[in-house]
Regions:
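Helical "lid/coupling" subdomains associated with nucleotide-phosphate turnover
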Residues: 2-159
């Protein structure tokens, strides 16, 4: 890894900023997608975006999407870790979830009910990140970003 950046594109912030209707309106989803694209374009130089060859998704949105895509009930971390989420599957998932009101999303197989309020924004963010980097899929990890940082430090120390 030669570049990293933190942005203000989290699911809670973006849900609060853009998704005020239940279910969210098309215009709200478009505004959210526009903002995420702008955040990434401003934060990540074009040459860096063009050089990315793979993505690993960590935390709630990625793991929730992997569980939804596999219709996991109960949740199984062994089946989530290493799962490859394709952009096409995420597009279908977004279309499905965005049509549901919050109460229906709370009952989606694979989705923890507490994630229902933010999952639509999360899928939009994940899709826009894939598009920004020209990727067709993301590999899901059950480990968090600190795990990845520790592995990087260990590799740098060993080599």
């Amino acid at each position: 890894m030669t570049f990293h950046v933190s942005t203000q594109a989290g699911v809670v912030r973006q849900t609060e900023r853009h998704l005020h209707s239940d279910p969210p309106r098309r215009e709200e989803l478009a505004a959210l997608a526009d903002e995420v694209r702008a955040i990434i374009a401003d934060a990540v130089p074009a040459d860096v975006r063009a050089s990315v060859v793979a993505a690993v998704g960590v935390a709630g949105t990625a793991t929730s999407c992997a569980a939804i895509d596999q219709e996991l009930d109960p949740y199984d971390p062994a089946r989530v870790h290493g799962y490859r989420l394709e952009a096409g599957a995420l597009e279908l998932m977004l279309a499905r979830l965005a049509e549901m009101d919050l109460e229906r999303r709370r009952h989606v197989t694979g989705l923890h009910p507490d994630r229902a309020p933010t999952i639509v924004a999360g899928v939009v963010i994940l899709l826009e990140a894939l598009r920004a980097f020209g990727l067709d899929e993301v590999e899901v990890s059950e480990h968090d970003i600190l795990w990845g940082a520790a592995l990087t430090v260990a590799a740098d120390t060993a080599g």
